[in-house]
Amino acid sequence: YDPLDKWLWNTPIPLPPTTPTAPAWQDTQHLLELGNLADPQLIPFWRETAVATLPHNSYHYEHLTIAAAALTLIAIRRQSEIAIHTLRHLTNNSRPDIRELAIHYLGRAYTEAGRPFPHTLLNDITLIAQHDTAFEPRYQARRILQIAGEPLPLDNPNGVYDFKVTPMHSRRTYRTIAIRSEQTLRDLQRFIQHAFEWDNDHLYSFYLNGRKYDGRYRFSSSYEENRPPWAYEAIIGQIGFPLGHHLLYHFDYTADHLFEIEVTAIRPQIRAGNYPRIIADHGKPPAQYA
């Protein structure tokens, strides 16, 4: 769901199914029309829409996304520093969902316009990447640093992460895998296949926020065309995983095998030996082929 792509490239937007005459649906359509105007006079309106859209409201995520994307479109088409400043201000909001989208679209305000990131902005983004308490804003900040060619923070250096991997169609079965901070999502993917005694013969993706098909958080197999970033590029300790975080592993898009992954421990020291390794298991591996 990306209104900025619709406005810039006329990409269709899939909206949640509902009755087209419902007030929330009509409000969403109206916001999309207003956003496409890229009117600098609407900057205060978009700022207020972002902060006033509450999580329990219908279409709250869509409305919040439209507000952040509309500010970005104004920054791109009108070269508005006020729109940029508004997005930067929203990156400090108390709500993580607002911070996440503000950081994501702030990055796009520069990349879509082909503008370099100012050093002052990169300094602020680095602080968010290191210290934000929520995963999504921290990860989005790290994506900006990566795009800008800046070094990424390495959390828990020389330590390990424990990932509990559970097939979503067989929740009584799991494998807990320990992997070093310096290893990659591709290392984790290969070992998941090994741990469940499955062939590794299909494409796959990780969705770091646990939402299937959310391209902002997707890392894919390197055999896929035009779908970077790749899993082999994603170093575990640079992603920004907090304890208790959940992500999604999608293997074999036709068979649609889904695995929930939970960060169950982040340990600063490792035992000698090879990693990844299984440290806990329960249940018989489910069949790969029906």
Segment roles from a protein language model:
Residues 32-36, 72-76, 91, 107:
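Ankyrin-repeat helical core positions
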Residues 59-62, 95, 134:
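Short coil/turn linker motifs that delimit alpha-helical repeat modules in TPR/alpha-solenoid proteins
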Residues 92-93, 131:
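Membrane-interface junctions
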Residues 23-31, 38, 63-69:
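Extended HEAT/HEAT-like alpha-solenoid repeat tracts in very large eukaryotic scaffold/adaptor proteins
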Residues 2-26, 38-45, 55-56, 75, ...:
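Short linear regulatory motifs enriched in tryptophan with gly/pro/ser
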